[in-house]
Amino acid sequence: NRMSPHFIFNVLNQEMGSRDGENKKELSSLVKLMRRNLELAEQMCVTLKEELGFVQTYIDLQRRSLGPEFKVTIEVGEDVDTNQLLLPSMLIQIPVENAIKHALQGKEGERRLWIDVHRSGTYICVRITDNGGGFKLNSANRGTGTGMKVIMQTIQILNAKNKEMIETSVHNIPLPDGETGCEVSF
């Protein structure tokens, strides 16, 4: 049994009409995020600009529950053309969601998330890093890994078709302030 996305968006848009101010803005962002998620889920690759726009909408929605201690830094190298660079859909969003959900939500104190996209020779490097204590294999807060499996399967398909391989790494890193973080890189 499936619900029609058209029906869901009609109901949400009707609900949005009955709200005002900040409540309307939040619901509008949620609707935008859901609509864009459906669109992106149908595409194998998107531009970096599209992916970062989607990620920014997601981060903005999460900001309320994470509070003022949640700080995000997004850096894109000047030599990276966000309109031309294609990458697998959800490549950045899924690790960002994982970082927020599994590392930063329950963290005390400052919660940091860094997204860095830069050129290294002929390659583009994408890094998503958090200060949530690092990846713990046996943690109770660990998810099912479904999101990362989707990314890995997509990368596997692309690597089978393309000359240039996409390499993936998930590892814990020491941060300059003495904390440990998790870094996902492509």
Language-model features: locations:
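A short beta-turn/loop motif at secondary-structure boundaries
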Residues: 175-176
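Two-component histidine phosphotransfer core
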Residues: 1-171
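Short C-terminal beta-strand
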Residues: 180-186
